[in-house]
Every structure is written in structure tokens, then in C-alpha cells.
Amino acid sequence: MLLLLAEYLQQFHKGFAVFQYLTLRGILGVLTALCLSLFLGPWMIRTLQNLQIGQSVRNDGPQSHLSKSGTPTMGGALILSSIGISTLLWADLHNRYVWVVLLVTLLFGAIGWVDDYRKVIEKNSKGLPSRWKYFWQSVFGVGAAIFLYTTAPSAVETTLIIPMLKDASIPLGIGFVVLTYFVIVGSSNAVNLTDGLDGLAIMPTVMVGGALGIFCYLSGNVKFAEYLLIPYVPGAGELIVFCGALIGAGLGFLWFNTYPAQVFMGDVGALALGAALGTIAVIVRQEIVLFIMGGVFVMETLSVVIQVASFKLTGRRVFRMAPIHHHFELKGWPEPRVIVRFWIITVILVLVGLATLKLR
């Protein structure tokens, strides 16, 4: 929006041409979303408290969590609104990738909002029934996949890239739709499973989102893409504005979500942010790198799968409680220790993911 204004004002002063630079608009995206979330955060927390939109806590979980009961939830709306406003202000609104990622994020956020609403407002402990949750996730995930597949200008945009191997790729054809569906929906649910401790999900999301922003910038520049032997995806660089907004909104939310949390993001935030990460990774053809950098999300998801499978097959539990962050809590780890150690793991994995740019 402001980019269009800057383009118009260039005829009066050439200095407005500076807004054409992706790096500047990416930084402005960070700062705008950060300021919005910090400014609106206290108001949103008070509003949620006045509406008595508080988190309910399971009695069979760690006893330390009982004190969290009643903490305002659905704070993910703060993240999404900050991301949305910042992206609309600074991104090129003629770019199809911007709209794909933004719409997927908001649509998955809508699923989470309905789930949270039923849990908190209607006092329905099950929230949105799983079959309906996965149905709408599938509808939106497949819809995004089909759009990206049918509008892909070149075969490279539907090819699976194998990192760390020179010229290693697998043409997917229509299989691209299937892979994209699993990446988007899987990422959405993985972040949601991780969102169980104060700040546990948001900081890894910020770090992975920032790294994906780097991939977007490099993939959208033909010279960098050729030098680094990564797919050149025209227009992908514009997503650095969205990634910047995600970073700013995430850090602003962390200001209020850090231990002990004043607000939780709820499904409205977790489902949306996970879907955003998955969609961006698909666009820049870095699904495997996302799997590496989002190792904490993968670990949390696998712990649930293993726990459920083991209990159904043998009647025994592998972990004291799943997702695995609760297992460590029940082993006696203080909540801040679990959180920070998972952050450290994410830092390491993000660095490994970025290293794949040069490891061939």
C-alpha cells in the first residue's frame, strides 16, 4: 500500500525510490509489526480479561500449570493483526506469493479462532471437532497447493530440492499438490502441539521465519540463486516483508508471552503461524530445510505420534506425558529450563539449515 504511494511520489522526489529496496521494506515490516503488537498488546490483554476469555488447564498435567488457569488466551489475534497490517503496508500487493501466504495464514487462523471460541466462550472442552478441523485445514491446504501448482511458471517451482547435494532434485508433477498439503497442514499442527509452555512456540517460529526470509530474499534474486545453486523463484523475495512482519509481531507478542505469560496465543495463533511457515517453505522449495530448522516442532509431533501408537499397541506410554515438553516438566525440569533449551536447539538447527546454502 505504502509502496504504491512511494512509487507515485517518486515523480516529485527521487528519494522515495529507496522504498523499492526489499531489505528496507523488510526492516520496516519488522518495526511496524513490533510497534503494533507492543502498542496493542496491553489493550488486547485487558479486553480478553474483561471478556473472561481465559485458558482452562488439564488436571492431569504438571501441577505447576494449575496457576495458569484463567490466563487470557486467543492472543494470536494480536500476532495476526500485526502481521496483516504490516504486510499490507509495506509489501508489493501485486505479488501473488504475498497474497497466498497472507490468505493461508488468515484462513488457518480462522480455524483456530473457531476452535478457541468453542473452548473458551461456549465452554466446549473439545472445541472444534477434529474431523471438522482437519477438513477445513485440508480444504485450505489443498486449495493453496492447487493454486501454486497451476500458476507455477516453471517446472523448478514444483520440484523437490534435496539440500547439500549438488543438482539433486525430484520432479514432483501432480505430487507437488500432495507434498504441499502435508507440509502446510503438518506445519500448522506441529506448531500447535509445541504451543504448550510460555514462549515455547513463538520464539522458534520467529527464528525459523527469519531464516525462511533469508531463503526468500536469495531465491528471488537470480544472481544469488545461481551462485548458491538454489531454485530461482521470481517474486519470492517480496516475502521478506511478510517474514519481517512475522518476526516483529512474534517478538512483540513474546514481550507478553514470556514466562510467566500474561497471554497465550491459542490455536488462532499457532495454527496460523505453522501454516505460514509451511507455505513459505513450499514457495521457495525448501521443504526439507524447514524439516531441519523446525526440528523442535518435528520432535514435539513425533512424541505425540509415538505416545499414541505405543499406548494403542502395547498399553504402555513411552513418555510420562506428550507432547515431549511436558515429559521433561514431569521429570523435574523447571518450565523456563525446558523453554530455553528448546530455543537453543532451534538456534542450532536454524544455523544448520542456513549452512545448507553452501554445503554442496
Swiss-Prot record:
Keyword Chaperone tagged: no
Catalysed conversion reaction: UDP-N-acetyl-alpha-D-muramoyl-L-alanyl-gamma-D-glutamyl-meso-2,6-diaminopimeloyl-D-alanyl-D-alanine + di-trans,octa-cis-undecaprenyl phosphate = di-trans,octa-cis-undecaprenyl diphospho-N-acetyl-alpha-D-muramoyl-L-alanyl-D-glutamyl-meso-2,6-diaminopimeloyl-D-alanyl-D-alanine + UMP
Record's keyword annotation contains Metal-binding: yes
Membrane topology according to the record: Multi-pass membrane protein
Coiled-coil residue spans: none
Subcellular location: Cell inner membrane
GO biological process, one term: cell wall organization
Molecular functions (GO terms): metal ion binding; phospho-N-acetylmuramoyl-pentapeptide-transferase activity; UDP-N-acetylmuramoyl-L-alanyl-D-glutamyl-meso-2,6-diaminopimelyl-D-alanyl-D-alanine:undecaprenyl-phosphate transferase activity
Record GO cellular component, one term: plasma membrane
Cofactors: Mg(2+)
Pathway: Cell wall biogenesis; peptidoglycan biosynthesis
Biological role stated in the UniProt entry: Catalyzes the initial step of the lipid cycle reactions in the biosynthesis of the cell wall peptidoglycan: transfers peptidoglycan precursor phospho-MurNAc-pentapeptide from UDP-MurNAc-pentapeptide onto the lipid carrier undecaprenyl phosphate, yielding undecaprenyl-pyrophosphoryl-MurNAc-pentapeptide, known as lipid I.
Family: Belongs to the glycosyltransferase 4 family. MraY subfamily.
Name listed for the protein in its UniProt record: Phospho-N-acetylmuramoyl-pentapeptide-transferase
Organism name: Pseudomonas fluorescens (strain SBW25)
Highest classification ranks of the organism: Bacteria, Pseudomonadati, Pseudomonadota, Gammaproteobacteria, Pseudomonadales
Protein encoded by which gene: mraY
